[in-house]
Curated annotation (Swiss-Prot):
PANTHER family: RIBOSOME-RELEASING FACTOR 2, MITOCHONDRIAL, TRANSLATION ELONGATION FACTOR G-RELATED. SUPFAM superfamilies: EF-G C-terminal domain-like (SSF54980), P-loop containing nucleoside triphosphate hydrolases (SSF52540), Ribosomal protein S5 domain 2-like (SSF54211), Translation proteins (SSF50447). It comes from Clostridium botulinum (strain Eklund 17B / Type B). The gene is fusA. This is Elongation factor G. One of its GO terms (molecular function) is GTPase activity.
Amino acid sequence: MARKYPLDKFRNFGIMAHIDAGKTTTTERILFYTGINHKIGETHDGASTMDWMVQEQERGITITSAATTCAWKEHELNIIDTPGHVDFTVEVERSLRVLDGAVTVLDAKSGVEPQTETVWRQADKYGVPRMIYVNKMDATGADFFRCISTVRDRLKGNAVPIQIPIGSEENFQGMIDLIRNVAILFYDDLGKDMREEAIPAEYAEKAEEYRAAMIEAIAEADEELMMKYLEGEEITEEELKAGLRKATIANEIYPCICGSSYKNKGVQQMIDGVVDYLPSPLDIPAVKGTNLEGEEAERNAADGEPLSALAFKIATDPFVGKLAYTRIYSGIMESGSYVLNSTKGKKERIGRLVKMHSNSRQEVESLEAGELGAVIGLKNTGTGDTLCSEKDPIILESMEFPEPVISVAIEPKTKAAQEKMGMALAKLAEEDPTFKTWTNEETGQTIIAGMGELHLDIIVDRLKREFKVECNVGAPQVAYKETIRKAVKAEAKYAKQSGGKGQYGHAVIEMEPTEGEYVFENAIVGGAIPREYIPAVDNGIQEASLNGIIAGYNVINFKVRLVHGSYHEVDSSEMAFKIAGSMAFKNAMAKADPVLLEPVEKVEITVPEEYMGDVIGDVNSRRGRMEGMEEVSGAQVIRAFVPLSEMFGYATSLRSRTQGRGVYSMVFDHYEEVPKSIQEEVAGNKTK
């Protein structure tokens, strides 16, 4: 089947933002203008096309990122709508992994908010080029220029306006396009009656100032344009666009535009911006991975290359079963063909292939390089797995997901539903890598763990709705961690000789605190421990580190060097060295000044001035550490770091303190040492 659009006409992009910045409404408007929806879905009345899970329609927030295909001006757009609620960062993380570009939506009255920072950092990690759309310009308190300065101050991004607004709040009428030097004015609420006019006289000076700043920023990123600029030559519209496109794709500039999605002003210009400035699959570097021998390999975006694709999301559909949302990086995937899941080393048959439009679908015969679609019929494929050609296998880099920070015990209301609940939880864990479930061996209880209270609420809600399992839920528990504060040397000898073959393993280790991942270094010289037993020592240490000595929590941020040991010709075995490694770790930890760590959240609270003293006092009583305050649109925004264990039930407390006028958001920030008294309390609770 011939391509409908060449690869350079593809735009795979996401729409990302803080909760309530108007992301889903913006996507709805894109679908409306690109001709897929005939009536615009409103998030307010629960009819939005992109928010298709029942819980999303009720809560008015986006939980699962729905991938949608549409067309605009001879380009194919694949849009991924990502949730802005902090508990669903996994959705943002996995969609960013497969995007080529993104539109960051900001609320014109709030600017950069905590979740914007989180999502921005995630996009930085994957090097995703972005443009910024300042939405809700019609809202009270809207301020485009303050918004742009929050991007520069809080995100350290080189935000360059390529439009400036005409009017704001209820007087928002349109924008000035600085590239083409014209005013775009809207005369109706559906964005149909839109006219280009000369720039109004009262805006001429401001437009000139911002246009000069924009031209200078674009010229700085391009030597040829810089020469023209310095020599005072006129830079054409085409040159400006080409220069801006290059700088945006290189992450040197973030073009900024404005609008009001709800009032249908500025959305078409935003889609034009996506086409003009965000990358096609050909503009991004070749995707990297490793072949089965562990050597580096890469694939270019081309139909003629061997197939490589990444399954970035697994969803269960009531009608067709398991859907694997997939990005094709190279080659062609055909329905009915066989591919290799190189991550798991298993062959898979491609059943049907569909292109998704939110939650309706169109069947296709094949998906080509650069396309996004869903595969039906895969048996063994999970999130982050690579699907590739059997002849030329490649394993693409998988995705990293954060560990859960909160857990609750859960039990079905009837004994008969126990098995059903187990199967349902396994299905949900397959869909969402940040959701974990296990059985507590001491109590026999089923534990579910996730990224926040809302995350677990929705899991329990889905159990009831989709799987018809009603559950009782216990009080939330915090996922503490343990670590060490000083470097030590320790040893352990495991010896068992009681007739017949004995056991013997002896390991001497040095252990020290470190920032970041666990590191094991083999420093054995002269064969004190035979090479084949060294991985066993490492395994013993890793296994023992899952249960620290203070309160049995996972031990993090440490490094181990295996420096010496001894073995027995007959009695030594992998098992003996594994036990020796585990014992050496426990001995070392006891001497290394162990401490308990707790998750600390970055909290942002917005309250009217009169409640500020009370709210700050409350934050301090929760062991909060103030980071700063500022006034935004007549309200006070308080920023602080607060331990997660102190934030349970905060929504209710804030509501009663501020008569329902305060709002807050929080995002996991880091782990930090707990005070001695709390460490003793946690350790005491664990031993009860």
